[in-house]
Amino acid sequence: SGTLLASLRDNNTLKTPITTPGAAVSTAEEALLASAEDDNGTSYYFRGAVTNNYVEFANKCWRIVRVGGDGSVKLILHNDNTAGVANPCSSANNSTDAAFARYSGTTYTSAFNANYNDNAYIGFMYGQAGASDYASAHANTNKSTILTNLETWYNNNLESYESKLADTIW
């Protein structure tokens, strides 16, 4: 009572997915809250064309993906609220470019890595370009462009909320 999970359960009927999670894409008719056991108890997840899983946090609009058995809430960014409006989840404020790295149909607006001419550059972090062995090329030594950008965004937008963030496996 009084928790986000209690509100989700009070306002949604638990249903069995029409399609098999992990094996099939949800159908247009599938919009539900389902449950499954995880390592920490019962988790709840939204699946399909759900319209009531929006939540405001850190002056941004997020969509609830899952509530883990430990009570942690997994969110994805819906609207970055760069305009700073009072209600970032209002449909009038939906952003067409909220994603941190958005695919435009031909390119991403943020490069994964500005460097590209060596297979060392394929990781989130990378090692030494031109290295003669795999371990040196793929060591976690240097940050990719996307990791640097993501860390900057986190520091500017979420770092002050760190006490409310769960460090858990997605």
Predicted features along the sequence, with ranges:
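Long, domain-scale functional regions
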Residues: 1-170
